[in-house]
From Swiss-Prot:
Location (main, coarse): membrane
SMART domains named in the record: AAA
Function: Part of the ABC transporter complex LolCDE involved in the translocation of mature outer membrane-directed lipoproteins, from the inner membrane to the periplasmic chaperone, LolA. Responsible for the formation of the LolA-lipoprotein complex in an ATP-dependent manner.
Enzyme class: translocase
Molecular function terms from GO: ATP binding; ATP hydrolysis activity; transmembrane transporter activity
Keyword line: ATP-binding, Cell inner membrane, Cell membrane, Membrane, Nucleotide-binding, Translocase, Transport
CDD domains named in the record: ABC_MJ0796_LolCDE_FtsE
Protein name: Lipoprotein-releasing system ATP-binding protein LolD
Membrane topology: Peripheral membrane protein
Source species taxonomy: Bacteria, Pseudomonadati, Pseudomonadota, Alphaproteobacteria, Rickettsiales
Organism: Neorickettsia sennetsu (strain ATCC VR-367 / Miyayama)
GO cellular component: plasma membrane
Amino acid sequence: MSGLALEFCNVSKFFRDKTEQEIAILRNTNLQIHTGEIIALIGASGVGKTTTLQIAGLLNKQDSGKVKICGKEASHLDTTLRRKEIGFIYQFHHLLSELNVLKNVMLPLLISGTPKTIAEKRAKELLEFLKLEKVAYQPVDTLSGGQKQRVAVARAVIKKPALIIADEPTGNLDPNTAKDVFDLVCSFAKENGSAVFLATHDPSFLQKASRVLEIVNHSLISSI
């Protein structure tokens, strides 16, 4: 992969409060994230970090401006583009309890049309790398919090996406486990040339970021 994984061109996003007053989250915001970059997003609670990541991940539509993924303009919430090019990791893993570990990891490939035998082979390789092969056929509810989040990382990266969106991915973990999970995300991103757009409150993660951006006055500005 090379070039731009994500681009905002004059992106604005508003919402209405209880009094129907229009409140800006982003206003005429420009952003470029290159493949291989790890971009940390910081800001006070409620300032719009999650909404910004949702717009980047084509889960929430901007009110004006353009969003491009790998140079392709997403004029709407493009499910095909999202499934192909974007992986998601959240604070709460959102694994499917009705599926075992292996099937959870396989799921993105199966949805995108990858043959089951190939999807299973890739998923097993990932679980072996993560030292989770012994729990591959266990229900996800039997895993520890750290194990669940590593499975969530595997599910996010198995497609080798151009862009990984991570919204407080370690916020529910102890510091040592959080570091392990974050290191895994960085390792996979480096190996695959993926960009990472990460919202975090953890100052230790900022040291590994290519850039740190902060939402200030409805715009993304460089910080630290």
